[in-house]
Amino acid sequence: MADVVYQAKLAVMRVLEKAPDAIGSVSSVATPQPHFVPTFDDGPTPGRTPDVMRALAAHDATATFFVLSTSVRANRSLLAELVAAGHEVGLHGTDHRHLSLMSPGEVRESVYAGKSELEDALGAPVRWFRPPYGDQTVSAWRQIEALGMQSVIWSSTSHDWNPFVDNDERVAKATAALKRGAIVLFHDGHASLPDGADDGPEPQLDRFDLVDRVLAGAAEQGLVGRSLGDALAAGGRLVTRAHFNLVPAPLNRRLIQRRRKATLARAAEAGLL
């Protein structure tokens, strides 16, 4: 029965993918410029965010950083460094819990608290929100919009969240998927138990090397990294699509738990725990 319900929800999700832009999340940018948008989640983090910033600076690139309140509280100076370097800051959440497992009221309370705290730290409004795991229900999306932010997902990934691949594979996959206006997912941190996440070990990788090589590959294609705000300021237009988790809550919870167990078991087998 669970599989039947799941398949039915997937069918509805495919219909929603073709829904009008008015109910969509930002997924890319239509731009006349040779720009793509590097985005970084889960920071700011000492030893990781500075490496990412060095790589961006080496290629005269800017990026959008989706930060966690749990990380910002411990690393306010890094947040200031990001802004001073010309990067853009959006909210990733007060923590890294799945919004799809929260009630609409819990989502609103959590997102409002994170937005208020981040705006106090920045002294400026926060426009962008990226749901942890990109996981949002329709009601969660409505709460985000009601709080004056736009939900931002991604069109391709660097695979830096995957502990089972190396940088050569990450770079190859990321550069192959690059195109004008793409929003690319990177990380400058790793959400863990204190952040409400339990997704296995942090991937051991050289983040400077990864970002540097992806940006170099982009340059070979005539592309340069720009934050979402910078891409829009240069004449870009937001492209949105419906991106929602429609799986019923009880089944959704079981599926998330199953994926976590599988990841942890694979990590243990690989000697990563």
Q: Across the structure, where does each feature detected by a protein language model lie?
A:
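Alpha-helical scaffolding within the catalytic cores
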Residues: 21-24, 49-50, 72-84, 134-141, ...
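CE4/NodB-like, metal-dependent polysaccharide N-deacetylase domain
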Residues: 53-62, 88, 104-150, 170-189, ...
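Active-site beta->alpha N-cap acidic-glycine motif
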Residues: 6-100, 106, 110-117, 124
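A short acidic, helix-capping loop that chelates divalent metal ions and anchors anionic groups
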Residues: 97-102, 192-198
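A cross-domain feature marking catalytic cores of carbohydrate-active enzymes
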Residues: 40, 67-69, 91-93, 130-133, ...
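His/Asp/Glu-enriched short active-site or ligand-binding loop at hydrolase and phosphoryl-transfer sites
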Residues: 135, 141-177, 222-234, 251-255
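Short low-complexity, flexible loop/linker segments enriched in glycine and/or proline
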Residues: 79-82, 105-107, 166-169, 239-244
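C-terminal domain-boundary segment and adjacent tail
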Residues: 20-31, 73, 196-273
